[in-house]
Amino acid sequence: MNRTFCNVALAVPLRTTFTYAVPEQLRAAVQPGVRVLVPFRQKSLVGVVVDLPERASEKAKIREISKVLNVIPALTPGLIELGHWIAGYYLAPVGEVFRAMLPPVTELRTQQQIIITAAGHQLVDSRPRTLGEEFAAEEIALLSKLIAKNGILPASTLEKSGVSSWALQRLARRGLVEIQHSLLARKQKTQTIVTWRTEDSEKREKSTNGSVEKRGRPLQGKALERFQEQTRRVRELLESRRGPLPLPQVLKLVEVSRSAVERMLACDLLYSWEEPIDPAEDPFDVGYAPPAHELNADQHMALKRIRARFELGEFGVQLLYGVTGSGKTEVYLRAIQETLARQKTALVLVPEIALTLWMGRQCRAWFGARFEGVAVLHSALSDVERAREWWRVRNADARVVVGTRSAVFAPLERLGLIIVDEEQENSYKQEETPRYNGRDVAIVRAKMENAVALLGSATPSLESYHHATTGKYELLTLGSRVENRALANVEVVDLREEFQQTHQASSISAKLRAGIQECLARGTQALVLINRRGYSWSVLCRSCGASVQCANCSISMTYHKNRNRLECHYCGFVAQTPKNCPKCDSKYVYFFGEGSERVEERLREEFPTARIARLDRDTTRTKRQYQETLGAFTGGALDILVGTQMLAKGHDFQRVTLVGVISADGLLSMPDFRASEHTFQLLTQVAGRAGRGELHGRVLIQTYYPEHYAIQDALKQDYLSFFERETNFRRTMGYPPFTSLAIVIVRNTNLEKAIRWSRQLSEYFSPHNGKGVRILGPAAAPLARLKKEYRFQFLLKSPKRSVLTKLLAGALHHCEKNEIPDTAVIVDMDPLSLM
């Protein structure tokens, strides 16, 4: 019998696949897209089958695959094609690409079933007495048992019945039985839901001072008063929300103990039951979902043009540019509705994990609370949760996927629409191999699957808006806020003048302090943005001027007061806070700069009665922490929310009337040609969080550089003015969208090797410099040492991306010939940062 082969992509830093032989007993299960366990050198690795070649090289010794891990292919043919495109475009190892595309390897339970076919039925019915002439006894026994069991048997029962796998395979090859695999459902996690009992509630509430056998002694005195106050707050919450709520949310929003709620249940004041938890659902959802608005003229026109694109039945990219609060989400939801009505599926990408919960909630509110067709995919899910969601999508149990960057690989079939919300965000760019941009991959996937790609933003990237103005993308514009609500008033606080007046370098100006006080007096909410984590940026010595540096990176360490230690935000290195300067032993060390932790502390000092929380990576390390804080703020349990840039993206806080930006200068000072763009985008986005409800909003931007055009245009929320000024700068300096960029970094823990290899690569680049491409470097990277590795950087510019691709492919081949390890060379195509 001829041997069967398969090409397997392995997660190793090599730009090739590996050929393996398929054992006879596994041939029925091996097909493109399945994960397999294979021997590789002296160990076993998990890989994905990408194709089945007819023959293999006769020179090489072909080893056999060891095991098929998923009998149902994890990747569709379209995703395999997309993976090869990513590997080619981003010059990434193909195995690393497919590793990024796949869900976590978890032991999902499957069941193998044996089903008799119509041909098998016909054979048994027509020749019951002569089967023995052609079939073995165990084959006849299997066919008879299938007939007796209505045509279906679990494969696990065959061995007990004395039927061999050989007999099963022989019947399957003759078309008399089929072998099918299905996923076994796991028991779902549940959560407690509580609601207020309305019948005779007042009578029961008054009697709660009586004995409750389930809870022990009756309450008296202050304990009774405290319980009655807690009962009142719970009742007000549940009645004002007009519906049941998850117990964790009730505990958070009204700040009551679990034991108090249990006593209310025992007193029959509350009714509770268990409901399954869907990973797509936010258990801290405060129940708010904006109602469907009557569409304004701009929204009508945008939807009309989206429908027209659907009617054409062909690929296209549309850029939905709308001011903050203009109703882009409603356009998204109606576009998804149109897609589902056409029996197709939809994919929604969002830049932050927290926004997956919010967008999933919008879908549920729009399509109905019991709509089970929404799946979520993001890194905060556990491996098991992610795998379950992935297979829900793969098995067509979910028709809408909401997720962050990696959700672009969701195995949806019949894909009709891909939405990329806040398409300009850097978080769509992967920082590790493979260094793909989720937005650009989404566009390519839409093209491959003949779907529509809808990019949305209030501050589009210069590249996307340039494509829209030149006709490559179709521009859809939402020019006004929903219900004609006014944009927030944006004011600049000049910190130079503030210092001259107060002679203090406080992070909270007098104007911001007064604005927060006014918010508290009115009972509305305030957001305070500080785009730095920690307590202080660095620890400096007043004697010698040295800062405390990370042992692994060329970067100052950040002081975190709540943990009383220094941390590197790049490699995670931790050190004790020094009492003396590590360099000169001076005792005159001080903390320089303020981060979100210090600003939170200042606000607590200024407003001791205010309810304040902080939202950054330090306070939201788990999915639950995200949900608790956002749920509490949205539900009105907090007055002030301090946070980093994650606050600026997409959230719809109805009661926020003030946004304060502690410093607009941090991003502007970065050594990056996109610094102005990032500053304008962040300021405009965060300004859009104010005044989204019925109350008017106000934004205060603190800066030492109020004259900069990025700040001036953000002040007016004038994207078109900023686009024109920044485009002129990019055209003059030869930056995107007028050229394509690539960065090559040579790295090693040994400085001499890093220098030698970068020189060898420079020798390859030198003859090409000036011939359709400009090559700068090698030079020490802005972060010259990172995670113990020394880094040298080349910057390549060309009007034609194909020139860069060809040149860089040659450079990688040159590295291979000169024995420069693959792991020592990073290629970043279309970088979003030059750091």
Name each model feature, range by range.
Residues 1-457, 469-485, 768, 795, ...:
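Accessory, non-ATPase domains that flank or precede helicase/AAA+ motor cores in DNA-metabolism machines
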Residues 13-15, 25, 44, 545, ...:
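A generic structural motif
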Residues 759-764:
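Long hydrophobic segments that form regular secondary structure
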Residues 789:
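Juxtacatalytic substrate-recognition/specificity segment
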Residues 290-296, 300-304, 313-755, 767, ...:
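Inter-lobe coupling/hinge segments of SF2-like helicase ATPases
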Residues 776:
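A C-terminal functional module that forms or caps the active site or interfaces directly
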